[in-house]
Amino acid sequence: MGFGGISLWQLLIVLAIIVLLFGTKKLRGIGGDLGGAVKGFKKAMSDEKNTDKEKPEQIQKSEESAPLDSAHTEKNKDNNKV
């Protein structure tokens, strides 16, 4: 018994038929495309983790700049009174 009731010989026969149908060059190209897609996915996931680490720093910077924004709005209120 192999994988889910499929024996090793059956897997080899299916693999041989696939190679005969598509050829080795086409299978190599498909494998390269699949590998590139996996590599891109892993890179995107690592970039996502890096942006998650940067978010607390950005929040802290925005809290520090908040008093500047409130001072600016007070000037606008004074200008509106005139």
Curated annotation (Swiss-Prot):
Instruction: Report if keyword Nuclease is assigned.
Output: no
The protein's superkingdom reads Bacteria
The entry's localization annotation reads: Cell inner membrane
Membrane-spanning intervals of the chain: 2-22
> InterPro entries under this entry?
TatA/B/E, TatA/E
Gene Ontology process terms (BP): protein transport by the Tat complex
**Record's bilayer topology term:** Single-pass membrane protein
Q: Name one GO cellular component term.
A: TAT protein transport complex
Which Gene3D superfamilies does the entry link to?
1.20.5.3310
Spans of biased composition, class Basic and acidic residues? 44-64, 71-82
Keywords, ordered alphabetically: Cell inner membrane, Cell membrane, Membrane, Protein transport, Translocation, Transmembrane, Transmembrane helix, Transport
An example Pfam family from this entry, by short name, is TatA_B_E
Listed GO MF terms: protein transmembrane transporter activity
Q: Please list where the region (Disordered) is annotated.
A: 43-82
Q: What exactly does this protein do?
A: Part of the twin-arginine translocation (Tat) system that transports large folded proteins containing a characteristic twin-arginine motif in their signal peptide across membranes. TatA could form the protein-conducting channel of the Tat system.
Q: Which family does it belong to?
A: Belongs to the TatA/E family.
Q: How does it associate, per the subunit comment?
A: The Tat system comprises two distinct complexes: a TatABC complex, containing multiple copies of TatA, TatB and TatC subunits, and a separate TatA complex, containing only TatA subunits. Substrates initially bind to the TatABC complex, which probably triggers association of the separate TatA complex to form the active translocon.
The record's section on PANTHER family has: SEC-INDEPENDENT PROTEIN TRANSLOCASE PROTEIN TATA
Its recorded name reads Sec-independent protein translocase protein TatA
